[in-house]
Amino acid sequence: NGEGELYIVFDEIMQGDNINFTRLTTASVVIIKAKTGKFSFLSAEPYTYRYIRIYSKNMKCTVNNLHLLRVGAPEVKKVLDSDNKKLQAIYNAAIETYRQNTFDIYMDCPSRERAGWLCDSFFTSRVEKALTGKSEVEHNFLENYILPESFKCLPDGMLPMCYPADHYDGVYIPNWAMWFVVELREY
């Protein structure tokens, strides 16, 4: 019929020979509805993966030039010049973690928790300042909490645990908002 679907599933681990794309209670899948013929596609969301598999439904396909477009904090210019290979590996992993978890705001984990959580931000903001000498992402992060007049499902004057995308299910940890005060003091 000239139309079909491509399913791109992905995850950070394999379970046997399979990719369990709902393992993290998320849907780690991109669905493309396409007509027969050549086309290009770009998906712009903060995915993380190590393994990827493509399935087709109602169409034959050939995939060319599949690649990841890197999105994250700019490359960090600070380096650790150490003869200790383990220490160097830890440092490099820390830089990589910072870059993946810092884009427009601080994220707990871009594959699972894409909102900015207070508490995490307190520590990540220190890393941003140490690595870049700036607090630009922290400014954006804190501003998200300051701009709204109120927050749905919270008492007046109280801040959410994470924003955007706080929990509206009655689960609330009040001391999480206190991290805002501690972070704002250092800012």
Task: Please name every model-derived segment.
Residues 143, 156-187:
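Conserved active-site neighborhood of enzyme catalytic/cofactor-binding cores
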Residues 95, 125, 142, 146, ...:
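Non-transmembrane alpha-helical segments in soluble domains
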Residues 123-134, 180-187:
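Well-ordered alpha-helical scaffold segments within catalytic/enzyme domains
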Residues 1-108, 120, 133-141, 151-168:
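Extracellular/oxidizing-compartment recognition motifs
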Residues 117-123, 130, 173-177:
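An alpha-helical repeat/solenoid feature that recognizes helix-turn-helix modules
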